[in-house]
A protein has these predicted regions:
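Short, cationic-aromatic polyanion-contact patches
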Residues: 4-18, 32, 65-87
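Short helix-to-turn junction characteristic of helix-turn-helix DNA-binding domains
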Residues: 14, 23-30
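A short acidic, leucine-rich amphipathic alpha-helix
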Residues: 22, 35-41, 54
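Short coil turns linking two alpha-helices in DNA-binding domains
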Residues: 29, 43-45
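Residues within the DNA-recognition helix of helix-turn-helix
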Residues: 50
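Glycine-centered, phosphate/nucleic-acid-interacting loop/turn motifs that mediate DNA/RNA or nucleotide
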Residues: 58, 64
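Amphipathic alpha-helical dimerization/coiled-coil segments
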Residues: 81-123
Length: 123
């Protein structure tokens, strides 16, 4: 979404304890659906439903992690950094601050410039 969602929509998503647990876990490190199910003690279908809802509001990001053997899977990281609510002259305004998750484990840079920059940093 390019615009911040309505306050009620964001609060509705955040009122769900499973969604909050997923955000909390993925704010520490990117996690797969199975890792989230184990960490947050919920079923994988519950994880997928909540992740989809969080993605609808750009509160979590999905990327593909690639293992050394070529297998790949989705990992999720919270993009929500801060939510502030302001009451001014009879109306509420919400401001959602997002962060760019760091590179996910197993993620390979696909852009040549990214690969070169990474190589240069490691010299």
């Amino acid at each position: 979404m390019s615009e911040d969602p309505a306050l009620g929509d964001v609060l509705d998503v955040l009122s769900d304890e499973y969604a909050r647990a997923i955000l909390a876990a993925t704010s520490v490190k990117p996690m797969s659906a199975q890792q989230l199910a184990d960490e947050c003690e919920m079923s994988k279908p519950t994880v997928y439903r909540r992740v989809e809802r969080l993605r609808d509001y750009d509160l979590i990001e999905e990327r593909t992690a690639i293992q050394d053997d070529g297998n790949h899977y989705s990992v999720y990281a919270a993009t929500l950094s801060e939510l502030s609510v302001e009451l001014d002259e009879g109306s509420f305004e919400a401001d959602v601050t997002r962060r760019e998750p760091e590179a996910f484990p197993g993620q390979r840079e696909t852009d040549t410039a990214d690969r070169f920059a990474k190589m240069w940093e490691n010299l």
